[in-house]
């Protein structure tokens, strides 16, 4: 049996059941485990529910239960500078960002990893549903989590080989239901705690109210593609391509009586375009351009390959052909795709392995850019 007692693993503990079980499993496997709670957002907020103080109490309770030391570290400045400023800039540019991807890249696996090294860590571990596998050459491959419904490789797609070399994902081979069972059997304080939702680290808030604190909303016209005025929108940043709810025009129907969706934006004119039908022609595209292209292991500077891809979390994989030039890529779809959204991540897969990905800049239909920003 391997002696893990001299291997120090620092676990990012959020106060949730997943990171609690992560720490428990590593402790049971004999590792020298240290828990760390990351505080990345200020507590005093007039909207929604801020749970940082209660979450830290849960971390303390679980750490005491399983017998590990624990610390709290403040990354508020790093989060603001590296994630939140990016988040706001993307919304200003009419895009729909995915802060979780950037949060993992810059905070959980950079700022936290650096801090863990100062504690003497050999590895860091988190409660993500993903797997790492080292090949005979020592290269680490990131694989999907065994629980298809919980797999989080989409959000981890910007991690580097250097980061993956130092990372453990103890829950990767488990189903979520098994994680709950382990927590309940061990009597962990977080066993019945509900999963968190909302923006990475910021928690559950009224998104419209939250965003309006930082970006002034500019109301404008809501129109159909053919120029019919449909009323007023509350501010382009509040809408995403393919969105159905929140338009306030449910009672206005054309001849086909189908629901209305956001089908485009014109940032320069402050116009929100809407159309009827889930598969409205303006929502369909057959290629995209992406930037910030990144692979989890070494790849050539320029190459073309075929794989599957996701354009949003929990979406079924789609077959694509990818041509990479440096940190940019053209991605051509085997079948037309709906609501490809600038600012979201496109993530590439080879079977179970997550190869990496990038950020969507523009969608195209037959070579013509879709009016999505």
UniProtKB/Swiss-Prot annotation:
Subcellular location: Cytoplasm
GO molecular function, one term: tRNA-uridine 2-sulfurtransferase activity
Enzyme Commission code(s) on record: 2.8.1.13
UniProt enzyme class: transferase
Site residues, Interaction with tRNA: 128, 344
Region annotated Interaction with tRNA, chain positions: 150-152, 312-313
UniProt entry keywords in alphabetical sequence: ATP-binding, Cytoplasm, Disulfide bond, Nucleotide-binding, RNA-binding, Transferase, tRNA processing, tRNA-binding
Region (Interaction with target base in tRNA): 98-100
Disulfide bridge positions per record: 103-200
GO annotation, biological process: tRNA wobble position uridine thiolation
Residue stretches spanning the membrane: none
Cited SUPFAM superfamilies: Adenine nucleotide alpha hydrolases-like
HAMAP family with a match to the protein in the record: tRNA_thiouridyl_MnmA
Family according to the record: Belongs to the MnmA/TRMU family.
Known function: Catalyzes the 2-thiolation of uridine at the wobble position (U34) of tRNA, leading to the formation of s(2)U34.
Protein's UniProt name: tRNA-specific 2-thiouridylase MnmA
Protein species of origin: Streptococcus pyogenes serotype M3 (strain ATCC BAA-595 / MGAS315)
């Amino acid at each position: 049996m391997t002696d893990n007692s001299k291997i120090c693993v620092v676990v990012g503990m959020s106060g949730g059941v997943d990171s609690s079980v992560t720490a428990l499993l590593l402790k049971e496997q004999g590792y020298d485990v240290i828990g760390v709670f990351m505080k990345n957002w200020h507590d005093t907020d007039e909207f929604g529910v801020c749970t940082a103080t209660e979450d830290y109490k849960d971390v303390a309770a679980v750490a005491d239960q399983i017998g590990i030391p624990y610390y709290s570290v403040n990354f508020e400045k790093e989060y603001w500078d590296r994630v939140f400023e990016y988040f706001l800039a993307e919304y200003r540019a009419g895009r729909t960002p995915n802060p979780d991807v950037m949060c993992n890249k810059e905070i959980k696996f950079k700022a936290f990893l650096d801090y863990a090294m100062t504690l003497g860590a050999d590895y860091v571990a988190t409660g993500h549903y993903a797997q790492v596998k080292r090949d005979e050459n020592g290269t680490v491959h990131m694989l999907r989590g065994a629980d298809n419904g919980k797999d989080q490789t989409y959000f981890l797609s910007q991690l580097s080989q250097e980061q993956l070399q130092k990372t453990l994902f103890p829950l990767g081979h488990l189903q979520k239901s098994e994680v709950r069972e382990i927590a309940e059997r061990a009597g962990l304080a977080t066993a019945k705690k509900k999963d968190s939702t909302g923006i990475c680290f910021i928690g559950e808030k009224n998104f419209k109210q939250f965003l309006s604190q930082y970006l002034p909303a500019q109301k404008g016209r809501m129109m159909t593609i053919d120029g019919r005025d449909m009323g007023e929108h509350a501010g382009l940043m509040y809408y995403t391509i393919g969105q159905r709810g929140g338009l306030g025009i449910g009672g206005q129907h054309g001849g086909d009586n189908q629901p209305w969706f956001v089908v485009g934006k014109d940032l320069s004119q402050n116009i929100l375009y809407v159309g009827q039908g889930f598969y409205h022609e303006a929502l369909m595209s057959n290629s995209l351009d992406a930037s910030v292209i990144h692979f989890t292991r070494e790849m050539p500077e320029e190459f073309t390959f075929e794989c599957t891809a996701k354009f949003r979390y929990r979406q079924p994989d789609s077959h694509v052909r990818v041509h990479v030039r440096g940190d940019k890529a053209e991605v051509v779809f085997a079948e037309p795709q709906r609501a490809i959204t600038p600012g979201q991540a496109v993530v590439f897969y080879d079977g179970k392995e997550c190869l990496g990905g990038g950020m969507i800049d523009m969608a195209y239909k037959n070579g013509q850019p879709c009016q999505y920003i």
